[in-house]
Structure formats: structure tokens, C-alpha cells
């Protein structure tokens, strides 16, 4: 996130609207001003716009953010435009307030917009809390994290440095992508819990199965159950054999009894058949009579149909005869109208000829009207051209007078041009001199600053060399001590190997009066001390080289400034035409500035006088061109006027000819039309030239022609229709008479045939034939009924004879005894089946339980082996290990190591190689694992101590380094949070001169990147080193914001 523009309205000491454009400030800027002017308020406004409150201990002053200088009726708000990657957003937040004319408090208002093209598009959110969530998702930092890594409030810049492990963990988890590690832990934990649950379930199932099947006595119980089951099956088999024998015997007796009962039923049915024989005989007679009447009915129906057809055709012939008589009467009436129709045809031809003459007269009248209009238009054009000619003559006279005046004014342009050029040369010479003077003054100031910096760096280099020499001497002394201690250690080891009366391996003596007895454990502290001194010496040597490189660079810059100053003196000598071997003093900047202003004023006046002469010259060209145009227009107007007058004379002659022609047509036309007495309108003589008059006459003639033509066509159409209809009716009547004769002959033939057939079938008349008819369904049903009756009677008679031959007359007396015996055997069989089913189920259950027991045992062993590694891995990842550290915490420790590595690069430069941050060694106390604490390693003392022991200035250096290291570490990760800004409120005043130089140098390095750094400080050296500033000017009516290099 990088701020682009901040707008304040009635916030803190800023009354009204104030805008800060961060894009015009460069990568690093300084906020300066008097105490209480409102410097910190700018950072508070940024935090308020994003999070709704200032950061740090100033979060409680949100009610005081509203300006006390503003009127109660005015609103107070903060608007921040910021970039996030390639996108630009704007957040607007209005403070809550209670207006003077209202009792209720106005709630806080918040909205977020995104830039689209040249406009802003508001991001739709239902509530303010939803908008704040969107802002948080964009920044990916809450207010606590923002004040620890982006905006370091006044007096609280060491928050992250001094935070405990829990607070650091919360901050780092949000800044770094540890979700994957946490997800891995959760996934391993879930799988471990699932595996443990599965194992517990299997163990419970195994205990239950062991209690149910008792695997120790399983085989004995199985053999007992199998023997009992076999015995029951043998008994069941014997019972089923006995039951089959008695059942067969009983079924034979029951079959004989059923046959006797069936014989009784058959005899009763045969008696019923004998009673139904007369009814079926009568039905057979009806069937025979219906079969004879069926062919006669078809013939009778045909005869009736022929009779009906004859009657219908006769009625149609009568109707057609009446229609033909009506058509003949209409034809006679049309023949009587033929003479009148012929007269109308001749009249139609006469009107057609008259229409041609009227159309000619109409065309002539139209031509007269058009020519009259053209003549009137030409007359108006001639009048207009005459007026234009008079106007152009007057303009020509006026332009001649104006040209005489401008000619006298343009005569002075050469003199004024010469004076203007001389002044331009003098001004260019003065500006070049002014530029050289200003550049020389800047180089003198830079050379002095660089000289002071070189002297300071020489002192630092000498100090670094002394430190390095001292560290080298300490290193040599420590090495000598280690060598001496190693010698003593060897002596102690050798002394411990000596035995009484045994020769010494060194001197060969058997007497050992004073063997070495020093403790050999003193070597390890010396070794650690030598390692620390070596590390310190390497750091000091590196720092000395860095200082020497910077000193060399500053000397080169100073030499460059001196060379540029000599070049400027040489250029000024050439400009003033002085001898380069003699010294030429560069004039004072103020004097040469006054000279430039004087020449500029004179040049402006000369330019105005030259512009007047040039303007007169330009104005002279325009009247000359206008005079030429006016004379050309005057000549063109005269020529066009002559053409228009000639055209008007020609039109007048043509108009006279057309009037003579229409007069001739008007004399001829009434004679032809009056002879026919058709055109009724009577017009005056002066209207004969009117187009409407001839148009009305033409329309009247055409109307009469259409009416006559329509009447004649209708007469011809009706006459033709009557002729055609009469011919068609005659042909139709003849055809129907032929059909009537054919039908009558067929009727007589069919009537004789039906009479002969009816006599042969013994029917007296047609009604008896109709009464004897039966439908096909009725006939089929009656025949099927008789056939079924005969077949059923024959079958029952044959079955009765067969059964009487098979059965006897005695009824067995032991049927009840057989039934009782069968019933007893059925009960025994059911008892045996129930016993077999119980034994089989018991045996199956026992076997199934034992198999489940064995399967469960195998599964438990397999699952135990499979889950062991998973459970162990889950315990290790979730902190159930020797160090009691979780996997995500281990990842955060790695990130913290990386942050401190970045931070130490800058901290060692600022502390001249003395301090570097170190992550505390992992340890476990009563409260658990403490792995995110930060310690400070002191290269001068070789000790490691808590960060809280640092002084104020040292704490500030460590906090700045840690904040920058945190930003560097985050930015190196793709997809991480982008930290493009860092805001520091005070803290530089606690640094000494050398530390301040180092801090400013590091900030200069950061300035070369794309990161923005804003600093609030009263340190004067920062104001000279940082070119871009925001100056807060304090007045008794509120503060004002000024940007740029203004002091």
C-alpha cells in the first residue's frame, strides 16, 4: 500500500480543506514544523481513514480529531487515495458529530471507491462494517500490525521489538503465509484422531466378540452342537417317511368319496338338461327362419332405395326447370337495354377525345404559372443585385481611407525590430551569467558540505582502525592463552596417566613429586571467547573497509565539485571575454538578478512597441485583401445583373406565346363539349389561364368516363353470366331425365325379383321378412348357446357312466383314525424342524462370531501398524514433542530468523558493527515454549543480552532495522503482502551524530527503490539531507500545509 493523496477537512489543527500530494514528494520525505503544529495529525488522518482510529496510544483521541477551529455546522472528514499494486483506491471517512441545530449525533460515514479509467466506481457495501472488512482484505493488516510494520507511532516504534512471543506470533501469522503449515497440522491431527477412533472401535469390538464367542471353548461347543443337529435330522427323516405313508392312504379314501359325490351332482344336472330341451328347439326354428330372411332383406332395401332415388331426381328436375325460366326472363330484359348501351359507348369515345384537349390546356396553364413565378423571382433578384451594387461601392470608398492610415503606422517596423534584437542579446548574456553564478554558489555549498563529511569520515576511519587494531591484539592474546591452556591440558592428562613406581613417558623418571593438577575444563570458555573476538574482528574489518569506500567516494565527489567550479570559471571568462590566465570574479547573484529583471522589463516594452507595428502591418494586409474582394464582387454583381435582365425579357416573350395558345384551346373546347351537354361548370374568361380551372374540367370528364365504362362493363358481365347459366341448366336437366329413366327401369326389375324370392321362403309380405331378421351377434349367440348345451349334456352323461363303473357302494370306516394319525405326525415333524432350526442358528452364530473375532484381530493388528507413523507425525507437528513446539510456530521462527538477517545488515551499519539481533534459543519453562524472543549480541563485550537493555537511541536503531527487515522479508515472497510504505514519527533525536549519519545513509539506500518513507522529526540535519518536505505552518487560526522544498 502506497499513499497517493490525503485530503483533510476540519481535522485537528487543520481548519478547512488541506491536501497532501504524496506523488510529488519522491520516495522519502520529511514532515517538519513547530511543536503542536499538527505533524502527527497527518499520520493520524491516514490511520483514521483506513481503520477508523489513530494508532498506538493516540487511539483514544478520536473524539478530538475534529478541529476546534471549525464551526459546529461544518463536517469533518479524511479522504485517502492509495495504490495497491496496479489498482488505485480512495477511502472517505467522516467523523461523528452533533450539529448545533440537532440533538442526535450524526453517525460516522465510510465508503470505498476504485478508479476505473478517468472516474471512480464505488464498491457496493451494505454496512460500514462490510466496507471495513473489504479494506482489511485489501491491506491484509489489522491496526495493530499496521502500527508495528508500516506506521511507527511517536514513542512506540519499538512495539514489535519489545513484544512477547505470543504477540509476535499473532503478527507474523498474519504477515507470512503459514496457512499451509497450519492446514497440514490440522489435516494430520484429523487423520490421527480418526485412526485412534478406528483403533478404539476395533478394540471394543474385539472385547465384545471375545465375550460372546469364548474362543477357548469354541471347538468343543461346535462338536456338541453338530452331534445334536445330526440326531434331530435322522428323527425328522423317519417321521417324514411315516407321514407320507399315512397321507397316501388317506388321500385314496378321500378321492373315492369325492367320486361318489360327483355322481350325485351329474344325475341332477342331466335331469335339468331334459327340462330345457323344448326351449332350445324353439330357438333353433328362429335361427333357421332368420337365415332365410337375410338375403330377402337386402333385396327389399335395394328396391326401397331405387324408389327414393327416383323421387329425388324428379324433384331436382322440377327445381332446375323453374330456375331456367327465371334466367330467360332476365335475358329478355337485357336485350331490351342494348340500344341505350350502344349510345353510352359512343358518348365514352367522345369524352376520351375531349380529355386529350383538356390535358393540353392544363399543361399550357401550368407552363404559364411557372413562367410567371420565374419572372417574379428574377424581378426580385434584379432589385437585390442593384442594392448590393450600391453597398459594395460604399465599402470600396471606406477601405481606401483605412489603408492610407495603416500605411503610415507600418513604416516604423524596421527601427523597432533592431532595438528589440539588441535587447534580446543583452538579456541572454545576463541570464547565462545568472545561471553560472547560481550553479557556482550551489557547487561551493556542496564542496563545503563534502569537505566536512570527508573530515568526519576520516575521524570515523581512524576510530575504526583503532578498534580493529585493539581487536587484533585481543585475538593474538587469546590465541596465546589457548595455546598455553592446551599445553597445560596435555600435562594434566599426562599426569592423570602416571602411576606410582611407573616411568614417565616424557622424562623416564619413576618419581613424580609435583604432577599437574589444573582443571582441563577451562579451555572451552577461551575457545568461545576467541570465536567471538574473531567474529568481532571480521565485522570491524568489514566496517573499516565500508568506511574507507565511503570516504573514497566522498573525496571523489569533492574533486568532482572542484573540477566543475573551475569549468564554470572558465565558461564565465569566455562569456565576459576575459583572459583565462587572469582571475575573473563571478558577480554576485543578487546584482545579476536585478540586471536581468531590468533588461526583461525593457525587452517587454520593446516587444509591445514592435507588436504594435507588426499588428499594423498585418492589419494592412487584411484591408487590401478586402478591397480586392469588394471590387471583384462589384464586377461580378454588375455582370449577374445584366444576365438577369436578359433572362427576364426572354421569359416575358414566352409567357405571351403560351397565353395565345391557351386562348385558342379555350375557344375550340366549348364547342365540342357543349354539343354533348356533359360539362356543367361555367367559368369566367379571366379564369381560363388558371391551372385549377382546367384540372377541375379534366376531373369532371374523367369521372363521367369512369361511370360510363363501369356501367357498360357491368352490363356485358351480367349478360354473359345469364347466357352461360342458361346453357348449363339445359344440359343438367337433360342428364337428370336420363338418370330418372334408368332408375325407374331398375326399380321394376328388382320388385319382380323380390316377390318371387319371398314366395319361395314362405313369407307373405315384407313386414314378416323384417320381423324374422336377427343381427349377426344375436344369431351367433343363439347358435353357440345350443351347441354348448348339447356338448355339456353329452359330456356329463359320459362322465356319469365312467364314474359308476369305477366306484363301489361302500364307505370306508377308518378315515377319522387316519386323519388323527396324520395330524400327530405333522406335529412331530414341526417339532423336529424347530429343533433343527434352533441348533443350526446356534451353530451358525457361533461360527460367524468366531470368524468375526479372528477378522477383527487381524484388522486391529494391521491398523495398529498402519496408524503408528501417522499418530507419531501428528504428535510431532502439534507440539507433543520434546521441545513442545508446533509446526507453524517452527515456521514462524524460521521467518523471524530471516527477518533478523535482513535487519542485521542495517543495524550493524548504524551501530558500526557492534550490535546484531539474534532469535533466542528455544527453551521450555513453566508456561511452555518461548521461541520468538529477540536478543541483542554485543560485539564489544561478546555478550548476548535482552533487547530491553538497549538505550533509547539503540532501541530506535534496532526498531527501524527490524521494521525494514520485516518489509524486505515480506516483499521477497510472491503473493505476500506488499509493504510499499514506512512512516516514522520522531525517534531520530535520540541518535548521536555518527548514528544519525548511518541512519540517513540507510534511508538514502531505501530511497533508490520503490518504497515510500515518511519521517516526522525536529532534527535539523534531516532537513538539509532530505530534499522533499511537508512544512506545517502554525498560526493562531489553525495550521496550513506547504509542500516541496519550501522552508
From Swiss-Prot:
It comes from the Bacteria. GO terms for biological process: DNA recombination; DNA replication; double-strand break repair. This is Nuclease SbcCD subunit C. GO terms for molecular function: ATP binding; ATP hydrolysis activity; endonuclease activity; exonuclease activity. PANTHER family: ABC TRANSPORTER ABCH.3. Residues 178-276, 305-332, 382-410, 521-547, 624-667, 698-729 form a coiled coil. SbcCD cleaves DNA hairpin structures. These structures can inhibit DNA replication and are intermediates in certain DNA recombination reactions. The complex acts as a 3'->5' double strand exonuclease that can open hairpins. It also has a 5' single-strand endonuclease activity. Heterodimer of SbcC and SbcD. Pfam families: AAA_23 (PF13476), SbcC_Walker_B (PF13558). ATP binds at residues 33-40. Belongs to the SMC family. SbcC subfamily. Keywords: ATP-binding, Coiled coil, DNA recombination, DNA replication, Endonuclease, Exonuclease, Hydrolase, Nuclease, Nucleotide-binding. It comes from Treponema pallidum (strain Nichols).
Amino acid at each position: 500500500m502506497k499513499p497517493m493523496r490525503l485530503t483533510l477537512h476540519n481535522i485537528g489543527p487543520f481548519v478547512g480543506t488541506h491536501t497532501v500530494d504524496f506523488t510529488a514528494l519522491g520516495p522519502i520525505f520529511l514532515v517538519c514544523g513547530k511543536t503542536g503544529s499538527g505533524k502527527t495529525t497527518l499520520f493520524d488522518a491516514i490511520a483514521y481513514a483506513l481503520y477508523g482510529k489513530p494508532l498506538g496510544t493516540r487511539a483514544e483521541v478520536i473524539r478530538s480529531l475534529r478541529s476546534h477551529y471549525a464551526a459546529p455546522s461544518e463536517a469533518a472528514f479524511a479522504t485517502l487515495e492509495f495504490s495497491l499494486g496496479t489498482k488505485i483506491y480512495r477511502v472517505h471517512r467522516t467523523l461523528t458529530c452533533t450539529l448545533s441545530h440537532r440533538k442526535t449525533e450524526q453517525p460516522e460515514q465510510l465508503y470505498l471507491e476504485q478508479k476505473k479509467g478517468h472516474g471512480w466506481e464505488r464498491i457496493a457495501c451494505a454496512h460500514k462494517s462490510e466496507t471495513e472488512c473489504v479494506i482489511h482484505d485489501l491491506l491484509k493488516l489489522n491496526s495493530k500490525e499496521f502500527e508495528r510494520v508500516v506506521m511507527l507511532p511517536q514513542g512506540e516504534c519499538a512495539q514489535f521489538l519489545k513484544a512477547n512471543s505470543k504477540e509476535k506470533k499473532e503478527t507474523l501469522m498474519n504477515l507470512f503465509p503459514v496457512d499451509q503449515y497450519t492446514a497440514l497440522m490440522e489435516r494430520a491431527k484429523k487423520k490421527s484422531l480418526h485412526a485412534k477412533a478406528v483403533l478404539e472401535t476395533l478394540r471394543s469390538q474385539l472385547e465384545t466378540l471375545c465375550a460372546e464367542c469364548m474362543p477357548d471353548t469354541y471347538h468343543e461347543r461346535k462338536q456338541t452342537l453338530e452331534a445334536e443337529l445330526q440326531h434331530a435330522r435322522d428323527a425328522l427323516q423317519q417321521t417324514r417317511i411315516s407321514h407320507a405313508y399315512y397321507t397316501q392312504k388317506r388321500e385314496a379314501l378321500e378321492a373315492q368319496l369325492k367320486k361318489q359325490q360327483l355322481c350325485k351332482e351329474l344325475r341332477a344336472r342331466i335331469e335339468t338338461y331334459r327340462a330345457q330341451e323344448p326351449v332350445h328347439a324353439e330357438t333353433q326354428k328362429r335361427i333357421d327362419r332368420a337365415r332365410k330372411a337375410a338375403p330377402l332383406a337386402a333385396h327389399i332395401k335395394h328396391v326401397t332405395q331405387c324408389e327414393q332415388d327416383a323421387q329425388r331426381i324428379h324433384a331436382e328436375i322440377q327445381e332446375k326447370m323453374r330456375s331456367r325460366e327465371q334466367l330467360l326472363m332476365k335475358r329478355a330484359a337485357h336485350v331490351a337495354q342494348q340500344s341505350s348501351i350502344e349510345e353510352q359507348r359512343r358518348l365514352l369515345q367522345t369524352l376520351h377525345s375531349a380529355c386529350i384537349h383538356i390535358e393540353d390546356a392544363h399543361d399550357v396553364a401550368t407552363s404559364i404559372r411557372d413562367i410567371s413565378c420565374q419572372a417574379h423571382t428574377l424581378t426580385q433578384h434584379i432589385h437585390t443585385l442593384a442594392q448590393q451594387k450600391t453597398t459594395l461601392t460604399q465599402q470600396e470608398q471606406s477601405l481606401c481611407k483605412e489603408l492610407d492610415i495603416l500605411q503610415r503606422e507600418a513604416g516604423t517596423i524596421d527601427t523597432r525590430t533592431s532595438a528589440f534584437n539588441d535587447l534580446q542579446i543583452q538579456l541572454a548574456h545576463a541570464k547565462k551569467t545568472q545561471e553560472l553564478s547560481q550553479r557556482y554558489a550551489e557547487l561551493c555549498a556542496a564542496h563545503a558540505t563534502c569537505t566536512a563529511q570527508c573530515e568526519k569520515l576520516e575521524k570515523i576511519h581512524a576510530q575504526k582502525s583503532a578498534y580493529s587494531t585493539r581487536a587484533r591484539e585481543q585475538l593474538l592474546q587469546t590465541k596465546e592463552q589457548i595455546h598455553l591452556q592446551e599445553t597445560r591440558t596435555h600435562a594434566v592428562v599426562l599426569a592423570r596417566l602416571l602411576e606410582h613406581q611407573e616411568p614417565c613417558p616424557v622424562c623416564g623418571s619413576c618419581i613424580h613429586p609435583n604432577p599437574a593438577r589444573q582443571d582441563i575444563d577451562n579451555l572451552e570458555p577461551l575457545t568461545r571467547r576467541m570465536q567471538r573476538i574473531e567474529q568481532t574482528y571480521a565485522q570491524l574489518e568489514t566496517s573499516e573497509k565500508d568506511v574507507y569506500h565511503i570516504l573514497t567516494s566522498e573525496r571523489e565527489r569533492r574533486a568532482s565539485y572542484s573540477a566543475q567550479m573551475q569549468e564554470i570559471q572558465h565558461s564565465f571568462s569566455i562569456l565576459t571575454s576575459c583572459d583565462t590566465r587572469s582571475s575573473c570574479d563571478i558577480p554576485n547573484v543578487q546584482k545579476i538578478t536585478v540586471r536581468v529583471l531590468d533588461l526583461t522589463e525593457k525587452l517587454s516594452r520593446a516587444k509591445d512597441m514592435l507588436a504594435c507595428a507588426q499588428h499594423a502591418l498585418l492589419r494592412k494586409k487584411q484591408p487590401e485583401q478586402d478591397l480586392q474582394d469588394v471590387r471583384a464582387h462589384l464586377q461580378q454583381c454588375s455582370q449577374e445583373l445584366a444576365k438577369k435582365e436578359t433572362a427576364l425579357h426572354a421569359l416575358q416573350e414566352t409567357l405571351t406565346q403560351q397565353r395565345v395558345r391557351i386562348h385558342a384551346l379555350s375557344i375550340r373546347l366549348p364547342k365540342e363539349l357543349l354539343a354533348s351537354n356533359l360539362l356543367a361548370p361555367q367559368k369566367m374568361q379571366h379564369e381560363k389561364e388558371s391551372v385549377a380551372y382546367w384540372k377541375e374540367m379534366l376531373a369532371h370528364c374523367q369521372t363521367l368516363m369512369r361511370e360510363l365504362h363501369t356501367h357498360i362493363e357491368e352490363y356485358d358481365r351480367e349478360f354473359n353470366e345469364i347466357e352461360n347459366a342458361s346453357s348449363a341448366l339445359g344440359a343438367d336437366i337433360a342428364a337428370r331425365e336420363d338418370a330418372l329413366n334408368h332408375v325407374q327401369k331398375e326399380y321394376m326389375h328388382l320388385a319382380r325379383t323380390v316377390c318371387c324370392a319371398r314366395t319361395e321362403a314362405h313369407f307373405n309380405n315384407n313386414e314378416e321378412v323384417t320381423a324374422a331378421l336377427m343381427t349377426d351377434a344375436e344369431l351367433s349367440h343363439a347358435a353357440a348357446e345350443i351347441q354348448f348345451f348339447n356338448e355339456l349334456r353329452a359330456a356329463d352323461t359320459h362322465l356319469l357312466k365312467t364314474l359308476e363303473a369305477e366306484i363301489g357302494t361302500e364307505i370306508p370306516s377308518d378315515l377319522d383314525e387316519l386323519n388323527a394319525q396324520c395330524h400327530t405326525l405333522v406335529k412331530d415333524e414341526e417339532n423336529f424342524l424347530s429343533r433343527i432350526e434352533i441348533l443350526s442358528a446356534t451353530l451358525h452364530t457361533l461360527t460367524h462370531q468366531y470368524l468375526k473375532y479372528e477378522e477383527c484381530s487381524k484388522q486391529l493388528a494391521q491398523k495398529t501398524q498402519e496408524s503408528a507413523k501417522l499418530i507419531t507425525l501428528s504428535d510431532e507437528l502439534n507440539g507433543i514433542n520434546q521441545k513442545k513446539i508446533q509446526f507453524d510456530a517452527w515456521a514462524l521462527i524460521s521467518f523471524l530468523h530471516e527477518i533478523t538477517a535482513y535487519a542485521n545488515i542495517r543495524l550493524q551499519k548504524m551501530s558500526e558493527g557492534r550490535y546484531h539481533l539474534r532469535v533466542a534459543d528455544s527453551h521450555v519453562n513453566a508456561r511452555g515454549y518461548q521461541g520468538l524472543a529477540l536478543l541483542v549480541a554485543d560485539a564489544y563485550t561478546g555478550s548476548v543480552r535482552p533487547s530491553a537493555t538497549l538505550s533509547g537511541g539503540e532501541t530506535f536503531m534496532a526498531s527501524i532495522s527490524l521494521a525494514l527487515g520485516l518489509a524486505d522479508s515480506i516483499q521477497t515472497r510472491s503473493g505476500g503482502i506488499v509493504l510499499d510504505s514506512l512512516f516514522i514519527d520522531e525517534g531520530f533525536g535520540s541518535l548521536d551524530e555518527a548514528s544519525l549519519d548511518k541512519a540517513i545513509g540507510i534511508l538514502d539506500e531505501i530511497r533508490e527503490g520503490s518504497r515510500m518513507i515518511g519521517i516526522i522529526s525536529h532534527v535539523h540535519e534531516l532537513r538539509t539531507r532530505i530534499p522533499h518536505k511537508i512544512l506545517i505552518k502554525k498560526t493562531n487560526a489553525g495550521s496550513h500545509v506547504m509542500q516541496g522544498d519550501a522552508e
